[in-house]
Protein backbone atom coordinates (compact mmCIF):
# COMPACT_ATOMS: atom_id res chain seq x y z
CA UNK A 1 0.00 0.00 0.00
CA UNK A 2 1.39 3.38 -1.00
CA UNK A 3 0.98 5.95 1.74
CA UNK A 4 1.75 9.64 1.82
CA UNK A 5 -0.10 12.78 2.75
CA UNK A 6 -0.35 16.24 4.19
CA UNK A 7 -2.28 15.89 7.40
CA UNK A 8 -2.28 12.11 7.61
CA UNK A 9 -1.27 9.13 5.52
CA UNK A 10 -3.10 8.88 2.21
CA UNK A 11 -3.88 5.67 0.38
CA UNK A 12 -3.62 5.85 -3.37
CA UNK A 13 -6.74 4.25 -4.81
CA UNK A 14 -6.61 1.85 -7.69
CA UNK A 15 -7.27 3.55 -11.02
CA UNK A 16 -10.89 3.48 -12.01
CA UNK A 17 -11.57 1.78 -15.32
CA UNK A 18 -15.27 2.50 -15.34
CA UNK A 19 -17.14 4.31 -18.04
CA UNK A 20 -16.81 8.04 -18.38
CA UNK A 21 -19.87 10.12 -17.66
CA UNK A 22 -19.55 13.84 -17.26
CA UNK A 23 -21.08 17.13 -18.18
CA UNK A 24 -20.26 18.08 -21.71
CA UNK A 25 -19.72 15.13 -23.71
CA UNK A 26 -17.46 14.28 -26.40
CA UNK A 27 -19.38 11.63 -28.02
CA UNK A 28 -21.78 10.97 -25.26
CA UNK A 29 -22.67 13.26 -22.32
CA UNK A 30 -23.91 16.48 -23.90
CA UNK A 31 -24.41 19.65 -21.90
CA UNK A 32 -27.91 21.03 -22.01
CA UNK A 33 -26.84 24.28 -20.37
CA UNK A 34 -23.34 24.72 -21.77
CA UNK A 35 -23.06 27.88 -23.80
CA UNK A 36 -26.73 27.54 -24.54
CA UNK A 37 -27.80 30.99 -23.76
CA UNK A 38 -24.48 27.72 -23.72
CA UNK A 39 -2.83 43.38 -20.75
CA UNK A 40 -0.54 42.79 -17.74
CA UNK A 41 1.54 39.62 -18.00
CA UNK A 42 0.97 39.39 -21.75
CA UNK A 43 4.60 38.61 -22.44
CA UNK A 44 7.51 37.45 -20.38
CA UNK A 45 8.93 40.94 -20.24
CA UNK A 46 5.76 42.26 -18.65
CA UNK A 47 5.29 42.45 -14.91
CA UNK A 48 3.24 39.48 -13.62
CA UNK A 49 0.05 40.13 -11.72
CA UNK A 50 0.67 40.73 -8.02
CA UNK A 51 0.46 37.71 -5.79
CA UNK A 52 -2.64 37.55 -3.60
CA UNK A 53 -2.15 37.07 0.10
CA UNK A 54 -1.45 33.41 0.79
CA UNK A 55 -3.89 31.32 2.73
CA UNK A 56 -3.39 31.45 6.46
CA UNK A 57 -3.17 27.67 6.66
CA UNK A 58 -2.27 24.78 4.40
CA UNK A 59 -4.95 22.57 3.00
CA UNK A 60 -5.82 19.53 5.06
CA UNK A 61 -6.99 16.57 2.98
CA UNK A 62 -9.23 13.88 4.40
CA UNK A 63 -10.56 10.66 2.85
CA UNK A 64 -13.80 11.26 0.96
CA UNK A 65 -16.02 9.93 -1.79
CA UNK A 66 -17.73 11.47 -4.78
CA UNK A 67 -20.99 10.08 -6.18
CA UNK A 68 -19.39 9.60 -9.60
CA UNK A 69 -16.54 7.42 -8.30
CA UNK A 70 -16.50 4.02 -6.65
CA UNK A 71 -13.10 4.56 -5.03
CA UNK A 72 -12.05 6.68 -2.09
CA UNK A 73 -10.11 9.86 -2.80
CA UNK A 74 -9.12 12.90 -0.71
CA UNK A 75 -10.96 16.18 -0.24
CA UNK A 76 -10.17 19.50 1.39
CA UNK A 77 -11.75 22.88 1.89
CA UNK A 78 -10.30 26.36 1.61
CA UNK A 79 -12.01 29.53 2.76
CA UNK A 80 -11.53 32.43 0.35
CA UNK A 81 -12.91 35.99 0.37
CA UNK A 82 -16.24 36.52 -1.32
CA UNK A 83 -14.88 39.78 -2.67
CA UNK A 84 -11.12 40.27 -2.51
CA UNK A 85 -11.54 44.02 -2.85
CA UNK A 86 -13.73 43.99 0.27
CA UNK A 87 -12.60 41.10 2.49
CA UNK A 88 -14.77 42.37 5.32
CA UNK A 89 -17.77 40.94 3.46
CA UNK A 90 -16.82 37.47 4.57
CA UNK A 91 -15.70 34.22 2.97
CA UNK A 92 -17.02 31.27 1.04
CA UNK A 93 -15.79 27.70 1.06
CA UNK A 94 -14.06 26.04 -1.90
CA UNK A 95 -14.11 22.27 -2.31
CA UNK A 96 -10.97 20.61 -3.66
CA UNK A 97 -10.82 16.92 -4.55
CA UNK A 98 -7.53 15.14 -5.10
CA UNK A 99 -6.95 11.90 -6.96
CA UNK A 100 -3.49 10.99 -5.69
CA UNK A 101 -0.70 9.76 -7.91
CA UNK A 102 0.15 6.08 -7.72
CA UNK A 103 3.64 6.69 -6.41
CA UNK A 104 5.31 7.51 -3.12
CA UNK A 105 7.00 10.54 -4.64
CA UNK A 106 4.69 12.40 -7.01
CA UNK A 107 5.88 15.30 -9.11
CA UNK A 108 5.44 18.70 -7.46
CA UNK A 109 3.23 20.01 -10.28
CA UNK A 110 -0.19 18.32 -10.27
CA UNK A 111 -2.69 18.43 -13.11
CA UNK A 112 -5.70 20.66 -12.40
CA UNK A 113 -8.88 19.97 -14.38
CA UNK A 114 -11.12 22.98 -15.07
CA UNK A 115 -14.72 22.17 -15.97
CA UNK A 116 -17.02 23.73 -18.54
CA UNK A 117 -20.40 25.36 -18.53
CA UNK A 118 -20.06 27.89 -17.09
CA UNK A 119 -21.66 26.22 -14.12
CA UNK A 120 -20.27 22.69 -14.23
CA UNK A 121 -18.68 21.29 -11.10
CA UNK A 122 -15.13 20.00 -11.51
CA UNK A 123 -16.04 17.05 -9.30
CA UNK A 124 -18.20 15.87 -12.20
CA UNK A 125 -14.94 15.22 -14.06
CA UNK A 126 -13.82 12.65 -11.50
CA UNK A 127 -14.43 9.64 -13.78
CA UNK A 128 -12.36 11.33 -16.48
CA UNK A 129 -9.61 12.08 -13.97
CA UNK A 130 -9.63 8.50 -12.69
CA UNK A 131 -9.26 7.22 -16.25
CA UNK A 132 -6.09 9.27 -16.81
CA UNK A 133 -4.06 6.32 -15.62
CA UNK A 134 -0.78 7.28 -17.28
CA UNK A 135 -0.90 10.81 -15.90
CA UNK A 136 -1.60 9.52 -12.39
CA UNK A 137 1.51 7.37 -12.42
CA UNK A 138 3.48 10.52 -11.62
CA UNK A 139 1.07 13.28 -10.66
CA UNK A 140 -1.87 14.09 -8.46
CA UNK A 141 -4.98 15.36 -10.21
CA UNK A 142 -6.89 18.19 -8.56
CA UNK A 143 -10.56 19.02 -9.09
CA UNK A 144 -11.53 22.46 -7.81
CA UNK A 145 -15.27 23.11 -7.87
CA UNK A 146 -15.72 26.71 -9.01
CA UNK A 147 -17.32 29.00 -6.46
CA UNK A 148 -21.08 28.73 -6.85
CA UNK A 149 -21.34 25.13 -8.03
CA UNK A 150 -20.76 21.58 -6.88
CA UNK A 151 -19.61 21.64 -3.26
CA UNK A 152 -18.11 25.14 -3.40
CA UNK A 153 -20.84 27.23 -1.78
CA UNK A 154 -23.31 26.47 -4.58
CA UNK A 155 -25.82 29.08 -5.65
CA UNK A 156 -29.39 27.97 -5.06
CA UNK A 157 -32.60 29.34 -6.53
CA UNK A 158 -35.85 27.42 -6.78
CA UNK A 159 -36.75 29.08 -10.08
CA UNK A 160 -34.05 27.12 -11.93
CA UNK A 161 -34.17 23.92 -9.88
CA UNK A 162 -35.27 21.22 -12.32
CA UNK A 163 -34.94 18.21 -10.04
CA UNK A 164 -38.65 18.01 -9.35
CA UNK A 165 -39.96 19.28 -12.66
CA UNK A 166 -41.81 17.20 -15.17
CA UNK A 167 -40.06 16.57 -18.47
CA UNK A 168 -42.44 19.02 -20.09
CA UNK A 169 -40.91 21.83 -17.99
CA UNK A 170 -37.23 21.16 -18.68
CA UNK A 171 -36.89 22.69 -22.14
CA UNK A 172 -35.58 26.14 -22.87
CA UNK A 173 -38.84 27.88 -23.67
CA UNK A 174 -39.81 30.34 -20.97
CA UNK A 175 -36.33 30.49 -19.47
CA UNK A 176 -36.17 34.30 -19.32
CA UNK A 177 -38.74 34.78 -16.52
CA UNK A 178 -37.17 31.92 -14.56
CA UNK A 179 -33.75 33.53 -14.75
CA UNK A 180 -35.12 36.89 -13.66
CA UNK A 181 -36.89 35.19 -10.76
CA UNK A 182 -33.65 33.42 -9.86
CA UNK A 183 -31.87 36.77 -9.65
CA UNK A 184 -34.52 38.03 -7.22
CA UNK A 185 -34.14 34.91 -5.10
CA UNK A 186 -30.36 35.31 -4.90
CA UNK A 187 -30.74 38.93 -3.82
CA UNK A 188 -33.21 37.84 -1.14
CA UNK A 189 -30.47 35.52 0.17
CA UNK A 190 -28.06 38.50 0.36
CA UNK A 191 -25.97 36.96 -2.40
CA UNK A 192 -24.02 39.28 -4.69
CA UNK A 193 -24.04 37.61 -8.15
CA UNK A 194 -20.90 39.52 -9.16
CA UNK A 195 -18.93 37.60 -6.53
CA UNK A 196 -19.12 34.55 -8.77
CA UNK A 197 -17.23 35.60 -11.90
CA UNK A 198 -14.46 34.04 -13.94
CA UNK A 199 -11.67 36.19 -12.51
CA UNK A 200 -12.75 35.47 -8.94
CA UNK A 201 -12.32 31.77 -9.70
CA UNK A 202 -8.92 32.44 -11.28
CA UNK A 203 -7.83 33.98 -7.98
CA UNK A 204 -9.29 30.99 -6.15
CA UNK A 205 -7.08 28.67 -8.21
CA UNK A 206 -4.08 30.78 -7.28
CA UNK A 207 -5.11 30.62 -3.62
CA UNK A 208 -5.21 26.81 -3.82
CA UNK A 209 -1.78 26.76 -5.47
CA UNK A 210 -0.35 28.90 -2.68
CA UNK A 211 -2.03 26.86 0.04
CA UNK A 212 -0.45 23.70 -1.39
CA UNK A 213 2.90 25.48 -1.87
CA UNK A 214 3.11 24.38 -5.49
CA UNK A 215 5.74 26.16 -7.58
CA UNK A 216 3.91 25.37 -10.83
CA UNK A 217 0.85 23.49 -12.04
CA UNK A 218 -0.37 21.82 -15.21
CA UNK A 219 -3.77 23.05 -16.35
CA UNK A 220 -6.38 21.28 -18.46
CA UNK A 221 -9.44 23.29 -19.42
CA UNK A 222 -12.48 22.00 -21.25
CA UNK A 223 -14.98 24.28 -22.99
CA UNK A 224 -15.64 27.25 -20.68
CA UNK A 225 -12.77 25.88 -18.59
CA UNK A 226 -10.44 27.04 -21.38
CA UNK A 227 -11.48 30.62 -20.63
CA UNK A 228 -10.53 30.14 -16.99
CA UNK A 229 -7.23 28.48 -17.93
CA UNK A 230 -6.29 31.24 -20.37
CA UNK A 231 -7.06 33.95 -17.84
CA UNK A 232 -4.90 32.17 -15.27
CA UNK A 233 -2.09 31.99 -17.83
CA UNK A 234 -2.51 35.68 -18.57
CA UNK A 235 -2.16 36.62 -14.89
CA UNK A 236 0.17 33.93 -13.51
CA UNK A 237 2.32 32.64 -16.40
CA UNK A 238 5.22 31.92 -14.07
CA UNK A 239 3.15 29.25 -12.31
CA UNK A 240 2.00 27.33 -15.40
CA UNK A 241 4.12 24.40 -16.58
CA UNK A 242 1.81 23.12 -19.34
CA UNK A 243 -1.58 24.17 -20.61
CA UNK A 244 -4.06 21.94 -22.45
CA UNK A 245 -7.11 23.59 -23.98
CA UNK A 246 -9.90 21.33 -25.24
CA UNK A 247 -12.96 22.78 -26.96
CA UNK A 248 -11.27 26.17 -27.00
CA UNK A 249 -13.23 29.31 -26.20
CA UNK A 250 -11.18 32.16 -27.64
CA UNK A 251 -11.00 35.23 -25.39
CA UNK A 252 -12.94 37.22 -27.98
CA UNK A 253 -15.91 34.85 -27.82
CA UNK A 254 -19.10 36.14 -26.25
CA UNK A 255 -21.10 33.12 -25.16
CA UNK A 256 -24.49 34.77 -25.51
CA UNK A 257 -23.73 35.70 -29.13
CA UNK A 258 -21.24 33.31 -30.69
CA UNK A 259 -22.78 30.09 -29.41
CA UNK A 260 -25.94 30.68 -31.42
CA UNK A 261 -24.02 31.26 -34.64
CA UNK A 262 -21.96 28.12 -34.10
CA UNK A 263 -25.02 26.01 -33.32
CA UNK A 264 -26.92 27.28 -36.33
CA UNK A 265 -23.95 26.58 -38.60
CA UNK A 266 -23.59 23.04 -37.22
CA UNK A 267 -27.31 22.32 -37.64
CA UNK A 268 -27.27 23.53 -41.25
CA UNK A 269 -24.13 21.52 -41.99
CA UNK A 270 -25.73 18.40 -40.53
CA UNK A 271 -28.88 18.85 -42.59
CA UNK A 272 -26.83 19.36 -45.76
CA UNK A 273 -24.70 16.32 -44.99
CA UNK A 274 -27.82 14.22 -44.56
CA UNK A 275 -29.28 15.44 -47.84
CA UNK A 276 -26.05 14.48 -49.61
CA UNK A 277 -26.13 10.95 -48.20
CA UNK A 278 -28.19 8.27 -49.90
CA UNK A 279 -28.48 6.23 -46.70
CA UNK A 280 -29.62 9.30 -44.76
CA UNK A 281 -32.19 10.21 -47.40
CA UNK A 282 -33.58 6.71 -47.01
CA UNK A 283 -34.44 7.69 -43.44
CA UNK A 284 -35.65 11.19 -44.26
CA UNK A 285 -35.77 12.26 -47.94
CA UNK A 286 -35.54 15.98 -47.22
CA UNK A 287 -34.42 16.76 -43.66
CA UNK A 288 -34.30 20.55 -44.11
CA UNK A 289 -37.82 20.63 -45.50
CA UNK A 290 -38.96 18.21 -42.79
CA UNK A 291 -37.63 20.48 -40.06
CA UNK A 292 -39.22 23.56 -41.58
CA UNK A 293 -42.52 21.71 -41.96
CA UNK A 294 -42.44 20.77 -38.30
CA UNK A 295 -41.58 24.30 -37.24
CA UNK A 296 -44.49 25.67 -39.26
CA UNK A 297 -46.85 23.08 -37.81
CA UNK A 298 -45.72 23.94 -34.29
CA UNK A 299 -45.99 27.71 -34.63
CA UNK A 300 -47.51 29.11 -31.43
CA UNK A 301 -49.62 28.01 -29.71
CA UNK A 302 -48.18 24.72 -30.93
CA UNK A 303 -49.51 21.21 -30.58
CA UNK A 304 -50.78 19.45 -27.48
CA UNK A 305 -49.12 16.04 -27.32
CA UNK A 306 -49.46 13.11 -24.94
CA UNK A 307 -46.47 10.99 -23.97
CA UNK A 308 -45.04 8.82 -21.23
CA UNK A 309 -42.22 10.42 -19.26
CA UNK A 310 -39.21 8.14 -19.90
CA UNK A 311 -37.99 8.76 -16.35
CA UNK A 312 -41.15 7.81 -14.50
CA UNK A 313 -43.42 6.14 -17.03
CA UNK A 314 -46.16 8.56 -16.02
CA UNK A 315 -48.54 9.82 -18.67
CA UNK A 316 -48.06 13.52 -19.35
CA UNK A 317 -49.15 16.15 -21.80
CA UNK A 318 -47.06 18.90 -23.31
CA UNK A 319 -47.86 22.00 -25.33
CA UNK A 320 -45.02 21.68 -27.84
CA UNK A 321 -44.19 24.69 -29.98
CA UNK A 322 -41.49 25.47 -32.54
CA UNK A 323 -39.09 27.02 -30.05
CA UNK A 324 -39.35 24.00 -27.79
CA UNK A 325 -38.61 21.70 -30.74
CA UNK A 326 -35.46 23.62 -31.64
CA UNK A 327 -34.36 23.74 -28.01
CA UNK A 328 -34.80 19.99 -27.71
CA UNK A 329 -32.75 19.41 -30.86
CA UNK A 330 -29.74 21.42 -29.65
CA UNK A 331 -28.10 18.73 -27.47
CA UNK A 332 -28.09 16.26 -30.36
CA UNK A 333 -25.49 18.39 -32.13
CA UNK A 334 -22.69 17.92 -29.59
CA UNK A 335 -21.54 14.51 -30.76
CA UNK A 336 -21.59 12.75 -34.15
CA UNK A 337 -23.33 9.61 -32.92
CA UNK A 338 -26.25 11.56 -31.46
CA UNK A 339 -26.35 14.02 -34.37
CA UNK A 340 -26.79 11.05 -36.68
CA UNK A 341 -30.16 10.37 -35.04
CA UNK A 342 -31.62 13.59 -36.42
CA UNK A 343 -33.31 12.08 -39.53
CA UNK A 344 -35.05 9.40 -37.46
CA UNK A 345 -36.19 11.98 -34.92
CA UNK A 346 -37.58 14.24 -37.66
CA UNK A 347 -39.33 11.39 -39.45
CA UNK A 348 -40.99 10.22 -36.26
CA UNK A 349 -42.10 13.75 -35.38
CA UNK A 350 -43.63 14.26 -38.82
CA UNK A 351 -45.75 11.21 -38.00
CA UNK A 352 -46.76 12.82 -34.68
CA UNK A 353 -44.44 10.54 -32.72
CA UNK A 354 -42.36 12.78 -30.49
CA UNK A 355 -41.24 10.03 -28.13
CA UNK A 356 -37.71 9.67 -29.64
CA UNK A 357 -37.12 13.41 -29.36
CA UNK A 358 -38.37 13.62 -25.78
CA UNK A 359 -36.43 10.53 -24.72
CA UNK A 360 -33.17 11.94 -26.08
CA UNK A 361 -33.84 15.30 -24.46
CA UNK A 362 -34.43 13.66 -21.10
CA UNK A 363 -31.31 11.53 -21.48
CA UNK A 364 -29.12 14.59 -21.91
CA UNK A 365 -30.91 16.52 -19.17
CA UNK A 366 -30.51 13.65 -16.70
CA UNK A 367 -26.79 13.40 -17.45
CA UNK A 368 -26.27 16.98 -16.37
CA UNK A 369 -28.75 17.11 -13.51
CA UNK A 370 -26.21 17.04 -10.69
CA UNK A 371 -23.29 18.53 -12.60
CA UNK A 372 -24.47 21.96 -13.73
CA UNK A 373 -25.55 24.92 -11.66
CA UNK A 374 -27.79 27.05 -13.89
CA UNK A 375 -27.74 29.98 -11.46
CA UNK A 376 -23.95 30.18 -11.77
CA UNK A 377 -24.24 29.83 -15.54
CA UNK A 378 -26.33 32.98 -15.75
CA UNK A 379 -24.39 34.80 -13.04
CA UNK A 380 -21.34 34.54 -15.31
CA UNK A 381 -22.78 34.85 -18.81
CA UNK A 382 -25.17 37.67 -17.93
CA UNK A 383 -22.45 39.67 -16.18
CA UNK A 384 -19.50 38.99 -18.50
CA UNK A 385 -20.82 38.10 -21.96
CA UNK A 386 -24.23 39.65 -22.53
CA UNK A 387 -23.05 43.23 -21.81
CA UNK A 388 -20.43 42.90 -24.57
CA UNK A 389 -23.11 42.32 -27.23
CA UNK A 390 -24.46 45.53 -28.75
CA UNK A 391 -28.11 46.06 -29.65
CA UNK A 392 -27.11 46.14 -33.30
CA UNK A 393 -25.32 42.81 -33.00
CA UNK A 394 -28.38 41.28 -31.36
CA UNK A 395 -30.69 42.49 -34.11
CA UNK A 396 -28.31 41.24 -36.78
CA UNK A 397 -28.09 37.85 -35.12
CA UNK A 398 -31.86 37.48 -34.87
CA UNK A 399 -32.34 38.44 -38.52
CA UNK A 400 -29.61 36.11 -39.78
CA UNK A 401 -30.78 33.05 -37.83
CA UNK A 402 -34.46 32.64 -38.68
CA UNK A 403 -34.70 29.15 -37.21
CA UNK A 404 -33.17 29.67 -33.78
CA UNK A 405 -33.41 33.43 -33.50
CA UNK A 406 -36.29 33.20 -31.04
CA UNK A 407 -34.20 31.05 -28.71
CA UNK A 408 -31.36 33.54 -28.89
CA UNK A 409 -33.79 36.35 -28.09
CA UNK A 410 -34.86 34.50 -24.94
CA UNK A 411 -31.26 34.17 -23.81
CA UNK A 412 -30.77 37.92 -24.22
CA UNK A 413 -34.00 38.68 -22.36
CA UNK A 414 -32.92 36.42 -19.50
CA UNK A 415 -30.01 38.74 -18.69
CA UNK A 416 -31.91 42.03 -18.64
CA UNK A 417 -31.93 42.45 -14.84
CA UNK A 418 -28.52 41.07 -13.97
CA UNK A 419 -25.70 43.43 -12.97
CA UNK A 420 -22.75 44.04 -15.28
CA UNK A 421 -19.29 42.93 -14.18
CA UNK A 422 -16.45 45.43 -14.05
CA UNK A 423 -13.76 43.73 -16.11
CA UNK A 424 -10.12 44.70 -16.72
CA UNK A 425 -9.05 46.36 -19.95
CA UNK A 426 -7.42 43.17 -21.22
CA UNK A 427 -10.66 41.19 -21.00
CA UNK A 428 -11.55 39.71 -24.36
CA UNK A 429 -8.11 40.39 -25.84
CA UNK A 430 -5.71 37.65 -26.99
CA UNK A 431 -3.58 35.98 -24.34
CA UNK A 432 0.08 36.41 -25.33
CA UNK A 433 2.71 33.98 -24.06
CA UNK A 434 6.12 32.97 -25.41
CA UNK A 435 7.25 30.35 -22.89
CA UNK A 436 4.48 28.00 -21.74
CA UNK A 437 3.80 25.02 -24.05
CA UNK A 438 0.12 24.92 -25.00
CA UNK A 439 -1.73 21.98 -26.55
CA UNK A 440 -4.99 22.97 -28.25
CA UNK A 441 -7.54 20.26 -29.12
CA UNK A 442 -10.62 20.77 -31.28
CA UNK A 443 -13.34 18.54 -32.65
CA UNK A 444 -14.04 19.27 -36.30
CA UNK A 445 -17.74 18.66 -35.63
CA UNK A 446 -17.97 20.77 -32.47
CA UNK A 447 -21.19 22.85 -32.55
CA UNK A 448 -20.21 25.42 -29.91
CA UNK A 449 -16.42 25.78 -29.84
CA UNK A 450 -15.44 25.21 -33.47
CA UNK A 451 -11.80 24.80 -34.55
CA UNK A 452 -11.65 28.43 -35.67
CA UNK A 453 -11.64 29.46 -32.00
CA UNK A 454 -8.57 27.33 -31.31
CA UNK A 455 -6.79 28.71 -34.37
CA UNK A 456 -7.51 32.26 -33.24
CA UNK A 457 -6.24 31.55 -29.73
CA UNK A 458 -3.07 29.87 -30.98
CA UNK A 459 -1.91 32.93 -32.92
CA UNK A 460 -0.49 34.64 -29.83
CA UNK A 461 0.87 31.53 -28.10
CA UNK A 462 4.40 30.99 -29.40
CA UNK A 463 4.82 27.42 -28.15
CA UNK A 464 1.65 25.71 -29.29
CA UNK A 465 0.41 22.62 -31.09
CA UNK A 466 -3.08 22.61 -32.59
CA UNK A 467 -4.75 19.26 -33.25
CA UNK A 468 -8.16 19.05 -34.91
CA UNK A 469 -9.88 15.68 -34.58
CA UNK A 470 -11.81 15.03 -37.76
CA UNK A 471 -14.66 12.86 -36.54
CA UNK A 472 -15.20 14.23 -33.03
CA UNK A 473 -17.60 16.80 -31.64
CA UNK A 474 -17.32 18.71 -28.37
CA UNK A 475 -14.32 17.67 -26.20
CA UNK A 476 -11.53 15.49 -27.60
CA UNK A 477 -9.61 14.45 -24.48
CA UNK A 478 -11.95 11.59 -23.62
CA UNK A 479 -11.83 9.99 -27.06
CA UNK A 480 -9.71 7.17 -28.45
CA UNK A 481 -5.99 7.69 -27.66
CA UNK A 482 -6.40 11.28 -26.45
CA UNK A 483 -5.84 10.39 -22.74
CA UNK A 484 -2.45 8.93 -23.69
CA UNK A 485 -1.68 12.04 -25.74
CA UNK A 486 -2.48 14.22 -22.74
CA UNK A 487 -0.32 12.05 -20.48
CA UNK A 488 2.65 12.27 -22.85
CA UNK A 489 2.38 16.05 -23.03
CA UNK A 490 2.05 16.58 -19.29
CA UNK A 491 4.96 14.22 -18.63
CA UNK A 492 7.42 15.81 -21.05
CA UNK A 493 6.08 19.38 -21.44
CA UNK A 494 7.40 18.98 -24.98
CA UNK A 495 5.10 19.53 -27.96
CA UNK A 496 7.60 18.08 -30.43
CA UNK A 497 7.57 14.61 -28.86
CA UNK A 498 3.83 13.93 -28.89
CA UNK A 499 3.00 10.38 -30.03
CA UNK A 500 2.71 10.72 -33.81
CA UNK A 501 0.49 7.66 -34.21
CA UNK A 502 -2.11 9.09 -31.85
CA UNK A 503 -1.98 12.54 -33.44
CA UNK A 504 -2.53 11.00 -36.88
CA UNK A 505 -5.37 8.85 -35.56
CA UNK A 506 -7.20 11.84 -34.14
CA UNK A 507 -6.63 14.09 -37.14
CA UNK A 508 -7.76 11.40 -39.59
CA UNK A 509 -10.71 10.16 -37.56
CA UNK A 510 -14.07 10.03 -39.30
CA UNK A 511 -17.55 10.40 -37.81
CA UNK A 512 -19.53 7.21 -37.17
CA UNK A 513 -21.56 5.98 -40.12
CA UNK A 514 -24.89 5.74 -38.36
CA UNK A 515 -27.10 6.92 -41.22
CA UNK A 516 -27.31 3.28 -42.28
CA UNK A 517 -27.98 1.95 -38.78
CA UNK A 518 -31.40 3.38 -37.92
CA UNK A 519 -33.14 2.97 -34.61
CA UNK A 520 -36.42 2.56 -36.46
CA UNK A 521 -37.47 1.38 -39.92
CA UNK A 522 -37.08 3.81 -42.79
CA UNK A 523 -40.35 5.29 -44.08
List where the protein language model places each region.
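Tryptophan (W) side chains
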Residues: 22-24
Amino acid sequence: MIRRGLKSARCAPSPSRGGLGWGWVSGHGVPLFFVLFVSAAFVVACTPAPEPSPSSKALSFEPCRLPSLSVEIQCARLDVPKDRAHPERGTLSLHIARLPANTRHPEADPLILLAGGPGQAASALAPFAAALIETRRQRDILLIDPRGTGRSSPLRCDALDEKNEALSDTVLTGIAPKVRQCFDQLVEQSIHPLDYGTLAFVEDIEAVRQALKLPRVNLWGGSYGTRVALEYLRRYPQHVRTLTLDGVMAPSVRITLNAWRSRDARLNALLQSCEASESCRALQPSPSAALDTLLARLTAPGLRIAFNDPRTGNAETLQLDSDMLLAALQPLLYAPDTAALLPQVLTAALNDDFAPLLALTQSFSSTLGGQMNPALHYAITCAEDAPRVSDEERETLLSELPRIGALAAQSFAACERWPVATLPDDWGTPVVNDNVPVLLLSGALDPVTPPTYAAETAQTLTKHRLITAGGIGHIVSTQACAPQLLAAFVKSANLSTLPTTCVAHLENSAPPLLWSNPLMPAP
